[in-house]
Amino acid sequence: LEKFGMKMLAVGDHGGYVMNEHGLKVSEIDEHVQKHGSLKGFYGPAYGYVRGVPIHKDEFFALETNVVIPAALEMQIGEEEAKHMKCDVIVEGANGPVTDKADEILKQRNITVVPDILANSGGVLVSYYEWLQNKQDVKWTEDDVLDKLDGKMAMCYTKVAKIAKEYDCTLREASFIYSLKSIEKVYQKRGIE
């Protein structure tokens, strides 16, 4: 996301939560976690500036920001977190990071949730591309794979967003509708009722 001009205000893991209002450097976070196994200790002066300050989990989920990406744990965002979140969009990078009750609260608060079924399906898609290359005995470059992935993910998001608008529902509900309609088409082609 850095390459698109976005800055990471905060990050958290089992070792704690860290914030820097000027933005955290992903490369430094990666280096620290590789060396220490968690974010624990990733704060204070380093490299000639303050990398970040430790914050509590409650502060983390109440930060005013555009996007929150829960990318590690299931049920990370429950009712309490949902009540206090100050973001426009949640992109589910993990499987099931938002509980059902939290999802309802976020819906009532007009916070858009890009569901896991849509947001984190890239790995499965790339596995399919790998299978396809092996099946066809061809080799794509990394750029080819990323281009295909970007195109497919954008197309799926566009279709799901259109369904959400058409049915006046959430992106999660629209993802399920899209999936069921896709299965229905296959059944119809095969003559299955």
Question: Which residues are covered by each model-predicted region?
Answer:
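Short helix/loop capping segments that flank catalytic or ligand/cofactor-binding pockets
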Residues: 19-21, 78, 100
